[in-house]
Amino acid sequence: MKVAENQKVYDITIIGGGPTGLFTAFYGGMRQASVKIIESLPQLGGQLSALYPEKYIYDVAGFPKVRAQELVDNLKEQMKKFDPTVCLEEAVDTLEKQADGIFKLVTNKQTHYSKSVIITAGNGAFQPRRLELEGTAKYEKKNLHYFVDDMNKFAGKRVVVFGGGDSAVDWTMMLEPIADKVTIVHRRDKFRAHEHSVESLMNSRAEVSTPYVPVELIGDDKIEQVVLQHVKTEEKIIIDVDDVIVNYGFVSSLGPIKNWGLDIQKNSILVNSKMETNIPGIYAAGDICTYEGKVKLIACGFGEAPTAVNNAKAYFDPNAKLQPMHSSSMF
């Protein structure tokens, strides 16, 4: 099958834009490869950005501690040096190797072509648990949010956060100094979040509504009010809002990856010491892959990324050296 003339064939296409994927993109640029990232979420950073942006990480080399979002921002800044192509809100449905050796990747939006593929999809594609109320779909991408990618857009707004876990509490605390008013709504009296986070929440100016559940959203084009119902007494209250943020957790799965002909062991892609899968030209790194002695840590993913890139480079360019120059001599 011939590639359409308007479709660029990339050297490396990375599936998954979490921390390992971002570092893979940077390293691919260092090897002078054309790189594309395909990410199913609306922003890069994977679970670090989507689930716990304000949490500190302590086991990344060179950082005594680093906020999850700060680490993501640094990785994005590092990656920018080589200006990779980034495709957001695209989930890869099919991945197949054509007769000419080029990989064809079909997403929910378009078709991509690549000489090699590196899968860095973490625990698999994950999607938010949505608010199950009538008419919610019409408010999505307006003022009903499942992700927070820019805190500043909530400045001076009246914001309601639904949820009781770490992410919901984290987002509430991040919004507290920015928003005009922020209210967190949880169906239980006690939060599931870390005790220290809950203590900080209770000592903040954020309003806490427990045990309440949302039962109705009111508004024409956008949500203007939310109706909350007390879990025990069924008493209803109405809150005026500018924005609603939902964090009921996420559901993750390998999804279509299971259908790509890869060797799968316990929901992970089996690779060898070169990060090669059973399909030549397809590699995997980070939490999505497994091998004997595998440890699932961000730090390990950062080590696996260069191995995958260097071997991918040698795959599509047999004249390339497997062992690269040291970065200190390249810039």
UniProtKB/Swiss-Prot annotation:
Disulfide topology: none
GO molecular function: ferredoxin-NADP+ reductase activity; flavin adenine dinucleotide binding; NADP binding
Pfam family, one: Pyr_redox_2
Keywords attached to this entry: FAD, Flavoprotein, NADP, Oxidoreductase
EC number in record: 1.18.1.2
Coiled coil (UniProt feature): none
Catalysed reactions, semicolon-separated: 2 reduced [2Fe-2S]-[ferredoxin] + NADP(+) + H(+) = 2 oxidized [2Fe-2S]-[ferredoxin] + NADPH
Record-stated family: Belongs to the ferredoxin--NADP reductase type 2 family.
Protein name (database record): Ferredoxin--NADP reductase 2
Organism: Bacillus anthracis
Lineage: Bacteria, Bacillati, Bacillota, Bacilli, Bacillales
